[in-house]
Regions:
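Non-heme Fe(II)-dependent double-stranded beta-helix
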Residues: 2-60, 64-156, 194
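Conserved double-stranded beta-helix
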Residues: 2-4, 18-19, 39, 187-289
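Short, solvent-exposed loop/turn segments at secondary-structure junctions
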Residues: 69-71, 139-140, 159, 172-174, ...
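Short Gly/aromatic-enriched secondary-structure transition segments
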Residues: 80-81, 181-183
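Active-site region of the double-stranded beta-helix
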Residues: 128, 156, 169-178, 184-186
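Generic beta-strand structural signal
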Residues: 128-130, 134-136, 150-152, 161-167, ...
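A short secondary-structure junction signal
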Residues: 147-151, 164-165, 175-182, 190-194, ...
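Short, conserved beta-strand element in jelly-roll/cupin
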Residues: 159-174, 220-221, 228, 251-254
Length: 289
């Protein structure tokens, strides 16, 4: 995989030479585990299954849980998504609706964001405390598959190691608007030039290298399917004209890259202590009374 200076001009190239060593150092310390931390969200057989998924995720960068959320919760999440995105067209993507403040919009989403088993996997992967930092509900209407802009092209998320959970709230097939992920690309340290703006796009790198095809996995499955992935790995959205795709995407961070997330105080206060700690570890919560 090409990891040199992105074609962003001489200024970016020079900045990359100066800033890359500092970026590598920060990311190295970000990835170091906390030896005093151990996730304790589940026990027994569930803990063993979570541990196996953690090992797979460390190896591949992504794990899939087909049909993980089931009725009646699945129906509640689907209803919450409909309420959250209705009347909210996505300004950055055509034929799409989204709500970046999903937890504020509907408390039902906490049942997915703070699911014990998913938290066990995330905690096992990070090996340190972590918090929810974004929760985005999205509905993609049919659009031409040739649309390859923004997150609908091969890229990494420019913030180093970062765990995302994507919950499919509609059936998604290999012919639909699925996400694709390049397995075993998640441990890369990107230089400064390939961590900023257009430099984080790897569309040409992936498309022009046929040997990578066998490492590409597709996030498909029935509604309720969950993908847990490290967004430092290369991934891409894909548009298509055959299916509507509905998803809830949650981002969890540890130590770095906390973002503002709007939450209702009464919803946080109603959480069990351990789950409340996951939310309140984010110092940038925006409290809405």
């Amino acid at each position: 995989m090409h990891n040199g200076t992105a074609p962003n001009g001489l200024g970016t190239a020079l900045a990359s030479i100066v800033k890359t060593p500092f970026g590598y150092a920060k990311e190295y310390f970000h990835r170091r585990p906390d030896p005093s931390y151990a996730p304790n969200f589940v026990s027994g057989e569930a803990k063993e299954r979570a541990g196996a998924l953690v090992e797979e995720m460390r190896r591949e960068g992504i794990v899939l849980l087909p049909g993980y959320f089931k009725q009646p919760l699945l129906g509640k999440l689907q209803g919450a998504l409909d309420r959250a995105v209705s009347g909210h067209p996505d300004k950055g993507n055509p034929n799409a609706f989204s709500n970046l403040n999903s937890l504020e919009a509907d408390a039902t989403f906490y049942d997915a964001a703070l699911d014990d088993f998913l938290l066990e996997v995330i905690g096992g992967y990070y090996q340190k405390r972590f918090a929810v930092t974004t929760a985005s509900a999205m509905r993609l209407l049919p659009a031409p598959s040739e649309l390859r802009t923004g997150s609908f092209q091969w890229h990494h998320d420019t913030r180093g190691r970062q765990v995302h959970v994507m919950v499919l709230l509609s059936d998604v097939t290999t012919k639909g608007q699925r996400m694709t992920y390049l397995k075993r690309s998640h441990n890369t340290y990107y230089n400064y030039a390939r961590s900023k703006d257009g430099g984080s796009r790897f569309e040409v790198d992936v498309v022009s290298n046929p040997s990578l095809k066998e490492r590409i996995t597709e996030v498909v499955g029935p509604a309720g399917t969950v993908a847990i992935f490290d967004s430092n790995g290369l991934h891409s959205g894909n548009r298509g004209e055959g299916e509507i795709r509905e998803t809830l995407t949650l981002c969890y961070v540890s130590w770095r890259h906390f973002k503002k997330v709007r939450v209702k105080r009464k919803d946080i206060e109603a959480l069990p202590p351990q789950k409340r700690q996951v939310m309140e570890f984010n110092p940038n919560l925006v409290w809405v009374d």
